[in-house]
Swiss-Prot record:
Similarity comment text for this entry: Belongs to the transketolase family. DXPS subfamily.
Keyword Repressor: no
Naturally occurring in which organism (per UniProt): Shewanella piezotolerans (strain WP3 / JCM 13877)
EC number in record: 2.2.1.7
Keyword Magnesium among record annotations: yes
PROSITE patterns in alphabetical order: TRANSKETOLASE_1 (PS00801), TRANSKETOLASE_2 (PS00802)
InterPro entries: Dxylulose-5-P_synthase (IPR005477), THDP-binding (IPR029061), Transketo_C/PFOR_II (IPR009014), Transketolase-like_Pyr-bd (IPR005475), Transketolase_BS (IPR020826), Transketolase_C (IPR033248), Transketolase_CS (IPR049557)
Annotated GO MF terms: 1-deoxy-D-xylulose-5-phosphate synthase activity; magnesium ion binding; thiamine pyrophosphate binding
Top EC class, one word: transferase
Protein name (Swiss-Prot/TrEMBL): 1-deoxy-D-xylulose-5-phosphate synthase
Any one Gene Ontology cellular component term annotated for this protein: cytosol
Length: 621
């Protein structure tokens, strides 16, 4: 599928940044309009991240127009906002394949394009990487410029300020563009402020500024007075004091949808020395009314027809595991005001919207700050509350030290509701929940549960809520649950005990999590026993011992990395019990899992019923 590029006559002339830089500046507003129109049609046909990219169209055009990319380094933080960048860097004709198996990567990816100078997916990494590239450019006297673009949401992460503090100390030449899209463009982002930004980034002003520093170096009292005067002038119209204190020269805020103002300001800033920050104000969903009104709802979209101004209605389906979790939260909070729920900026994705509305005093959004979210839970536990930290598997990686040092070490009863465990699909290797069982299993005092369906998920969450001897984790996948009938009555499960779901002979399949249905189907071909292990830690020692003594071969199945996962725990236990037994471990291989539809990936990894059956047959051959 491709579009008739003649509908976009200026964009047709700018398939690469080199071609873009050949265009007269006068046509850039039209290019931005066409780029936005192409993005609308492209994502409408393919699905993908949507609102953020609509907000960065003018910025993307201006950066590639002013800077000599890829020689000059451009780093996008996270990458949701980088679709226009992909369109302008030679990937326009393949944009309809984005997030699909074998298609364009959902985020900037070094292996995909020389214009993607740093692979991203998690937030807050761009400034650190940009600083390193700026230092390298100075060491090599390469003359290249370095630019990072970071959204205001990512600025809540401590890593960003660690990097900015270091950059202010090293004082290398670099530009950080703060894309502030949390509010509509305010009154001070107009002609006066754009003019001031261009003035303060211009050569005349900056030359006087730097020369004055040298002259006043020996006169500290007068130098301090001059500094305060400058800050007062800038402070009348700009909120940049914090960045100035970190050692950055702050310019802005300016209208991020005025491509001419962006070009002029970037031209002025391109040759400034030291760390610079340009604050621009944009609107998520710019140019598409439904996305402007509801940028969260239009953050990522399925295939849709832009002309209808609405997303297609969702097909009726079983509730998602996230919704099951959200309902459980509300059910418990109705009876216990000491239940507190914490999320690192994933309210919608984690199923917590209703809870946040009904129990606002028990709800805490820690923003994109996973380390803080985990330790916040630890602090609440110290004061007698029952904190539930709802977090995606991939983002728990960022709070691992806090999990160990602040929670498990102190045996604090924090419940971790770990969403997106296993394959998540289209967001690719930065977001697959491949490692949580492995890295949690090594932590003392942890109880780790893996439900096979939504009812077990509900009961396990309640088990964690009731358990006061230390931290617990309930790990469940993305997407629709299995359709199991939910039991409203909540009962705490016996810790470390599994269940036999099918009695067979010779082969025993020890299943961990929602692969149970596939394991049961595969078992039919071998008349195998199937156990729903439920607990990854502690393991059911008695059950594993019994299965090892009464079967010839054990098979472990999990949607987690094989290395260090639940199957590894079974092998370790068998060695401890001095029970040598052939064990086939089925799970995720020792590689980063690429993007694609979840069903496609599961099939390719042979974790569906047919794949599990084939792996067992191959092992027995």
């Amino acid at each position: 599928m491709s579009f008739d590029i003649s509908q976009f006559p200026v964009l047709a002339q700018a398939n690469t940044p080199d071609e873009l830089r050949q265009l007269p500046q006068a046509v850039l507003p039209q290019l931005a309009d066409e780029l936005r129109g192409f993005l609308l049609k492209s994502v409408g046909k393919s699905s993908g991240h949507f609102a953020s990219g609509l907000g960065t169209v003018e910025l993307t055009v201006a950066i590639h127009y002013v800077y000599n990319t890829p020689f000059d380094r451009l780093i996008w933080d996270v990458g949701h906002q980088a679709y226009p960048h992909k369109i302008l860097t030679g990937r326009r004709e393949r944009m309809h394949t984005i997030r699909q198996k074998g298609g364009v990567h959902p985020f900037p990816w070094r292996e995909e394009s020389e214009y993607d100078t740093f692979s991203v997916g998690h937030s807050g990494t761009s400034v650190s990487a940009a600083l390193a590239m700026a230092v390298a450019a100075e060491k090599e006297q390469a003359g290249r410029k370095v630019v990072s673009v970071i959204g205001d949401g990512a600025m809540t992460g401590g890593m960003v300020f660690e990097a900015m503090n270091h950059a202010g100390d090293l004082h290398n030449d670099m530009l950080v563009i703060l894309n502030d899209n949390e509010m509509s463009i305010s009154e001070n982002v107009g002609a006066l402020n754009n003019h001031l930004a261009q003035l303060m980034s211009g050569r005349f002003y900056t030359t006087i500024r730097e020369n004055s520093k040298k002259v006043l170096k020996g006169m500290p009292v007068i130098k301090e007075m001059a500094k305060r005067t400058e800050e007062h002038l800038k402070g009348m119209v700009v909120p940049g004091t914090m960045f100035e204190e970190l050692g950055f020269n702050y310019i802005g805020p300016i209208d991020g949808h005025d491509v001419d103002a962006l070009v002029e300001t970037l031209r002025n800033m391109r040759n400034l020395s030291g760390p610079q920050i340009l604050h621009i104000m944009t609107k998520k969903g710019r140019g598409y009314e439904p996305a402007e009104k509801d940028p969260i709802g239009w953050h990522a979209v399925p295939k849709f027809d832009p002309s209808t101004f609405e997303k297609p209605a969702s097909k009726p389906s079983d509730p998602t595991f996230s919704q099951v979790f959200g309902k459980w939260l509300c059910d418990v909070a109705e009876k216990d005001e000491k239940l507190l729920a914490i999320t690192p900026a994933m309210r919608e994705g984690s199923g917590m919207v209703e809870f946040s509305q009904r129990f606002p005093k028990q709800y805490f959004d820690a923003a994109i700050a996973e380390q803080h979210a985990v330790t916040l839970g630890a602090g609440f536990a110290c004061e007698g509350y029952t904190p539930v930290v709802a977090i995606y598997s991939t983002f728990l990686q960022r709070g691992y030290d806090q999990l160990i040092h602040d929670v498990a070490l102190q045996k604090l009863p924090v419940v971790f509701a770990i969403d997106r465990g296993g394959i998540v699909g289209a967001d690719g290797p930065t977001h697959q929940g491949a490692f949580d069982l492995s890295f949690m299993r090594t932590v003392p005092n942890m109880v780790i549960m893996a439900p096979s369906d939504e009812n077990e998920c509900r009961q396990m969450l309640y088990t964690g809520y009731c358990y006061k001897a230390g931290p617990t984790a309930v790990r469940y996948p993305r997407g629709s649950a299995t359709g199991a009938k939910q039991v409203e009555t909540m009962t705490a499960l016996p810790i470390g005990k599994g269940l036999i779901k099918r009695q067979g002979q010779k082969i025993a399949i020890l299943n961990f999590g929602t692969t149970l249905a596939n394991s049961l189907v595969a078992a039919e071909a071998f008349d195998a026993t199937v156990a729903d292990m439920r607990f990854v830690k502690p393991l059911d020692v008695d059950l594993i011992k019994e299965l090892a003594e009464t079967h010839d071969v054990l098979v472990t199945v999990e949607e987690n990395a094989i290395m260090g996962g639940a199957g590894s725990g079974v092998l370790e236990l068998l060695q401890t019990l001095k029970l040598p037994k052939p064990v086939l471990q089925i799970g995720l291989p020792d590689e980063f899992i690429k993007h694609g539809a979840p069903d496609e990936i599961i099939s390719e990894l042979r974790l569906d019923a047919a794949g599990i059956e084939k792996q067992i047959a191959d092992y027995l051959a």
